Amino acid sequence: MGADKGGQEDEHPAHQVTLAAFWLDKTEVTNEAYERCVAAKVCRPHDPKSSQLNKFGGDEAFRAPRQPISSISWEESKTYCQWLGKRLPREAEWEKAARGTDARRYPWGNDPPDATRGVYAGSRTAEVGSRPAGAGPYGHLDMAGNVWEWLEDIYDPYAYRRVGADRGIPGSCEEVMTAQNELRQKGQQGYTGSNPIPTECERNLRGGAFNYDGPGLRSSNRVHHPASFRLIMSGVRCAKDG
């Protein structure tokens, strides 16, 4: 897990993780699947008002039945998965599904992305499973591009640097927000003095998105946002214990 070369600081160092058995959905959650949860009056109806929608062609460009649900928050993603008797994936589980055991750079291997393998560098999502050439080592689809996928874990920029049994385990909300503020003050890992001081724990997302370039699709790449954020490029896929 992680990367020693070609990654961001929060991906260092590469390290081995042992996981219990788990299941991960083959595809991202679709609009039509999420709407069944809305109809059951469990999930929140989609809100078309978003500051990022018009930039990419308006809400209608993202709402076909088989496109992945987007503009969904971490809390809403968690509610949906729990409705199905599932849960959000953990960061290590997601990376295992995307990389297998050979530390590949992308789900399909180490070759650079192209249009047959991922939905990226564009202006809208595509139907889930539309890039079978980009399948991961266990057959999962769209793990590089389409939408970022919310994960259970709190984002901790220092998690991989811990030693022993604590490696990879995020700290408490208070510890993590303090660490992020330190990075903000130092201008490290993409933070600058103008970045706002965190006011809530951020959660991890993985997998790249339709509007990201090729390097952003690396399977070890870690992205993070506050759990309440609804971004046009954020979606979900569910997991459950094995």
Regions found by a protein language model. Name each.
Residues 3, 21, 30, 110, ...:
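Non-catalytic surface loops within mature trypsin-like serine protease
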Residues 231-242:
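Short, structured beta-strand segments at or near domain termini in extracellular proteins/domains
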Residues 23-25, 83, 237-239:
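Residues within well-ordered beta-strands of beta-sheet-rich folds
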Residues 15-16, 25, 137-139, 227-228:
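Short, surface-exposed beta-strand/loop micro-motifs that present aromatic residues
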Residues 2-6, 50-223, 230-232:
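Functional-site microenvironments in short loops/helix caps that host divalent-cation chemistry
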Residues 1-52, 72-75, 144-145, 152:
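A short glycine-rich, aromatic-capped structural motif
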